[in-house]
Structure formats: C-alpha cells, structure tokens
Amino acid sequence: MKAVERKSDLNKRNSQDKNKHYSLNKTIKVDSGSGRLMTGITSAFLLYMLVIYPLALHDHYFDITYTKYTVFKVGVILFAVIWAMGLVIVLTGINAGGMKGRHAGGNVKVGTMDKLKAVICDGVYGTDICMVLFFISGVMSFIMAEDKKNAFTGAQGRYCGLAFMILIFIMYIIVSARVSNMEKMWSLISMVFVLVSSVTFIIAILQNIGFDPFKLLDGINRKQRNIYVSTFGNIDIFGSFICIALPLFMGLYVTEKSNIKRIVYGIGVFAGFMAFIPANADVVFAGVGATIIAVLFATVYMERVDRLFELVMLGSGGYLGMVLLRMLVGTNGAKITGFNRLAEHPALLVIIFAVVLFIRLIIQVYINRNKTEIYINENKSEVYINKQKNGTGIKLIIALAVVLISGIAVIIYGRKNNLAMFDFNDKWGSYRGYIWRRVTGLYGELPFVQKIFGHGNESIRSLMDDRFYDEMLQVTGTVYDNAHNEYLQYLVTQGLLGMLSYVGVVGTAVITGVKKIKKSPYILGLLLAVISYGVQAIFNVNQCITTPYMFLMTAMLIGMCRRATEE
C-alpha cells in the first residue's frame, strides 16, 4: 500500500511538473509571438518620434509650435489606435498565421491573463504611480481653470493643456509596457536617431556660419534671426533637444561594445558639442554639465573610465572645432552670450582643462580593475581563487571631491571677475530672475485649493497680464506666457500636486535607472537623457516640441528596467 502511495505521489508530482512546463512554454510562446507584434508597433512609433518628428516643419518658423504639436498629436492618436488593435488581436488569440486560441508555434491554449502579461507590465514602479498623479493633477488643474477652452488646448501658451497631458499619459503607458526584444530594436533605432539628430545639428551649424540651405530664416526680422535655429525654432528649445539627444549618445557610447556603433555614437557626440555655439543657450551647459558629472560617476562605477576620457576628447574637440570653423568661414553676425563666453576667458578654460587632467590622473592612479587569479595545485584536485577588490567606493568619493572642488573653483572665478551669470537679479538669465520672482509671488497669492491643484493649465499668461502687463513691457520689453522654469510652471498651473508628482516622475525614474544600470547596455543613455532634461528644466520652458521627448525617454527607461527585472 505504501508503495502504491509513493507511486501515486510520484505521478502527481510529475503531473505538476508537466503543468509547470506547459505554463512556462505558454509564457515563452506568448512573449515571442504577441510580443513581437507589440514590439513592432512600438518600434514604428519610436521611429516616427525620432525620425519624422524632429524634422517636421510647415511654414518655416512661423507656425512651428502648432505644427510640432499637430504632428505629435496625430502620431500618438494613430499609435494608440494601432496599439489597441494589436492588443485585441493578442487577447482574442488571433496571430499572424490566422490561428485562434493557439499561438503560432505552439499547441497549448493560452489564457487571457497570460496574453495580457505578454504585453502589459507585470508590476508597478514608483514612476508609474507618479505619472498617474501627474495626470490627475492636470485634470484637477483643468477643473480649477476659469478659461476651460485654453486650459484644454493650451493655445494661450505652448499647447501644454489637458489635451497634451492626455497624449503624454497615453504615450507613457504604452511605451513603458512590457515588450519583447525591445533592446535589439532600440539599438537600431538609436543609431538612426543619431543620424537624424546630426542633421538638425548640421543645419544649426550652417546657419551659424551664414548659410541657410533650406531658407528657414526667410521672412524673419534680422533682429530676431539669432534666436531661431535648426528645425526646432527658438534657441532654448533647440538647446532642450540637445539636452535629450547628446546625453543619450554619450551613455550609449560608454556601454556599446561594437566599435562601429561606438563610432556612430561618437559622431553624434562630436556634432552635438559643435551645436553648443549655434544653440547659444545656457540651458545646454546646465543639462550637459549635469550629464558629464553623472557620466563620471557611472564610468567609475561601471569600470569604464576610459570611455569618459574619450567623451571629454570628443566633446572638447567638437566645441573647439566649431570655434575654429567660425574663425575660418565667418559667422551670421550672432553674438556669443552666456556660458559660451567661456571661450573669451582663457584662464577659466585652463582651469577646466586642469580639472579634466586631474580627473584623468586620479583615475589612472586609483583604478583597479577586477582581477581573478586562479591557482591549481599539482594534482589538480583543488582550485584557489583570489579576487582583488576594485575599490569602487574610494573612487566614487574621489570623483565627488573633484566635482565639488571644480564647481567651487568656477564659482569663485566667476564672482571675482564679475561674470553676469553669477550675479542673480531681475536681469539674470535673460530676465529669468524677474519672471521667477513674480511667479513665486503669484503662487503665494492663490487660494488654498489652487495652491494644491493649480490655477489652470497654461494660465501663466493670464495671471501675468492681469498683474504685471505694463511692468513686463517696461522692464523686459516682452510679455511672458511661461515661468521659464518647469517646476515653477507646474507649481502655479497644476499646484503643489502637479509640481511634486512631476519631480517624482523624474526622481523615481533616475533612482530606478541607477539601480538597474548594469542590467542593460541601453539604460545608461536613457538615464542620462532624463537627468539632463530634468536639470535644464530648471531654466527652460515646458512646451509641445521637446517636452514629449522627456516623457518618451522616461517611458523607455522604465520599460527597459522592467524588462531587465524580468530577465
């Protein structure tokens, strides 16, 4: 009787193991088939956003904001419809081979939940929660708004109304979902993005030295030509794009193993630094400066400091190459302002070079790569392994010290030489000092409910017109429709909930990316893009031209981290 019970138990275990085996097969087959379908749809959208969207123009710069918004809106809506259709195909069990209830390549019926998990993420990240809260804040801001039409369309500002919030929320949910083999597709798509971005950089470079091959500046007042560039319009917006593309290429350069692909990414880095001068926007130095600091820590942690040195050479070579090109060919008459005036201060350039050289020497002295020594005794019966410690903690502390010392040195030099960038007043940062002070005061005057949920989407223009219209024209000569600080912008328009949830989106995405940085070679580039945009957002405007890239890169980052966790 006992023997029979043992046999029964054995059969039961075999049956359970067999069921587990089939369950595993079901997951794999759903992931490999329906996953490919959804990956293809997502890849098509990424190509749309990274190839077509950057180059989209209609009437030169005259309607560029509306044109970009329309292209983005059409792309997201079309993508959402196709994605929903793909999801229906997956859930109904219909595949490319016309089979229903079974997946191509398998004989096992797959449940709806298994199919859904093959497409939608299996787990929630902090960024997902913050993104939901950010969307809710946009809805609440719309409810608080007096002008509902403007709050929905955002036409009074930069088309960042509730409609825009809906679009980025849909894009985030779909792009960050679980898809199979996204890493392989992203490798190809990112290289195409390098080429497209380089085209936009080259257009800006040519315009800066007096050539306008596509006649984009025709009809623009000569006094205003210096603030329009490339296929993005305003120099600050173009600078914002650089803060997305360049850090992405830098991260991919660090982690890429293929020499050919690394050369392509290197070209993107070189061209991106050349575009610093045509952009002529301090936001570029803020975003990319933060990126360089992040790359320093990342390369030390990942034991790839050689790539950091190569990036420094590529970056400095690109910037100096643009300076030389302007000297040889001439310019369009645009004056170099802000941090680009560093070229006029040789002593400060020497300090920067000395800091870079010091970092390199420190790295050379303290880097200890992982080394494993294997000893085998004579009769080969025992093996001894001696693994040396790499001292990563010490190197990170040294890197932090170098960053702090160099930062203090730059500030001291700037203050002693009375550089305008270090003197905060109403004129600071092209009157950002003025608008920040006024917007902060406006927030303090809002009712308590609006302090929490905001005065209304894209409502800065109406608030400033009501209180400071004459003063704005007298002091700055222009009318402001944005706080020129994304965090202050969301604080006033979407309240404390909107500002904190936006900070949460950026912060949790960065934390997640740091934790998973070694899980995928594509995480670092996306992480750097989010960091760079988050820093430049302190000095720039949220708008429908480059702000979508921030949420796209965040969605891609979370999607990659999600996939890395599952693997």
Predicted feature locations:
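Alpha-helical transmembrane segments of multi-pass inner-membrane proteins
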Residues: 2-3, 9, 25-37, 41-56, ...
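Membrane-interfacial, low-structure loops and terminal tails that flank and connect transmembrane helices
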Residues: 2-35, 93-125, 366-393
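N-terminal hydrophobic segments of proteins, predominantly signal-anchor/transmembrane helices
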Residues: 48-61, 80-166, 199
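Membrane-interface catalytic loops of GT-C/OST-like multi-pass glycosylation enzymes that act
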Residues: 61-67, 152-157, 235-236, 280-287, ...
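Aromatic-rich transmembrane-lumenal/periplasmic boundary elements in polytopic membrane proteins
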Residues: 155-159, 203-218, 408-459
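Alpha-helical membrane-protein architecture signal
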Residues: 225, 436, 453-456, 480-488, ...
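TM-adjacent membrane-interface loops and short helices in multi-pass inner/ER membrane proteins
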Residues: 234, 431-479, 494-498
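Internal/C-terminal transmembrane anchor helices
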Residues: 391-413
